A protein has these predicted regions:
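PLP-dependent aminotransferase class I/II
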Residues: 4-8, 13, 17-19, 26, ...
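Short active-site oxyanion
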Residues: 69-70, 122
Length: 221
């Protein structure tokens, strides 16, 4: 039985949060957003991280805002927040009480200090990324067979990635383009390829094997 929806804000571009939350409300489901790419993304009502029951953010070194390593879980529910705080601190409730199995998931002082410094510059970083994204989009629009995602309306991206679609009308394949870019020092990525379900430890699992996800396989490839 389905208990929750786990949507992904991908490439710094938000999901259709209003439609997802309508589905969740109708079916009495929790919504847990994979917001690894979404720090600094805004929608019509403010930060995209305010949506859902939880938003899980990555602060890995590759992200627009980072602490080299780390992340955060955003929750509007006080009880959930306290529970997460206990989990990341060995399950401690107070100095003398442990009431659940926890982990050492606390952020180090060094990583936290780095994050505080980065916060001072995040608006400037996103503005610069937008300028680069706008330039790419204007120039790539002149090339037949290359498609950019384009505007996301009143939503505000953090421009963390610049995805393109290589169409059949382009003179070479996506993989050949990838190789040529790499030879010229441009390190593009086939981001979600291969799927996790194609990895050896999962591939033969009847519940999670790749044959159960034909649409995801088609999109990723």
């Amino acid at each position: 039985q389905t208990e929750a929806i786990l949507p992904v804000h991908v490439y710094g571009r938000p999901c259709d949060v209003d439609e997802i939350e309508k589905i969740a409300a109708k079916n009495k489901l929790k919504v847990i957003y994979d917001a690894a790419h979404a720090f600094g993304v805004n929608c019509h009502c403010g930060s995209i991280l305010n949506h859902g029951d939880l938003s899980v953010v990555s602060f890995h070194a590759t992200k627009v805002f980072n602490t080299f390593e780390g992340g955060a879980i955003i929750s509007k529910n006080r009880e959930t927040k306290l529970y997460i705080d206990q989990l990341k601190n060995f399950g401690f409730v107070d100095e003398n009480t442990v009431d659940q199995i926890g982990i050492n998931g606390k952020m180090s002082e060094f990583n936290a200090a780095l994050g505080l410094v980065q916060l001072k510059h995040i608006d400037k970083v996103i503005t610069k990324r937008k300028a680069i994204s706008d330039h790419y989009e204007s120039q790539l629009a002149k090339i037949e067979g290359i498609s950019c995602i384009g505007s996301i309306g009143e939503m505000k991206s953090n421009y963390s990635y610049f995805p393109i679609l290589v169409k059949n009308s382009f003179p070479i394949s996506r993989d050949d383009l990838y190789d040529k870019l790499k030879l010229n020092g441009i390190h593009a990525r086939k981001y979600f390829y291969p799927l996790i379900t194609n990895f050896p430890m999962i591939h033969d699992n009847r519940a999670f094997g790749s044959e159960r996800f034909p649409i995801a396989n088609r999109v990723s490839s």
